[in-house]
Amino acid sequence: MARDLAIDLGTANTLVYAKGQGIVLNEPSVIALNQQTGDVLAMGQEAWQMIGRTPGYIVAVRPLRQGAITDFDVTQRMIRLLLQRAGVSKFNRPRVVICVPSAITEVERRAVTEAARRAGAADAQLIEEPMAAAIGAGMAIHEPVANMVIDVGGGTSETALIS
């Protein structure tokens, strides 16, 4: 049960990293919802496999588009399920860092942190995706040298010069 988690909340896939454990989840960013009841039936790979194989009232929802939240409620529910799968409980609320595209607005940034807090995070901080990629690649981000980062994702692609 990790107290520190990092989430790459991607348009196509979502990864969860737990401090000391590495990547503990790598799932498609999709949820299967029962439109009649509002219940979440599945998330990730399980929801992906349901596409086209369920009655019409069960829909697959991708709550992010181009790295920004398009459905706040579904995003919150997806983050809650991700936290549960990572071993988080009501009594074990983690600190969370979430990767976001550099170009999202301040309102979109607040939506991400609020969704994470409502989903069960004790604290939620954001890091821009190119910076997270540079840190993850072991680049010396505090050194007086320039590093170019190209982050290609399912919904956004970014290029950054980090020095």
Predicted feature residues:
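Nucleotide/phosphate-binding catalytic cleft detector across ATP-hydrolyzing
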Residues: 1-154, 160-163
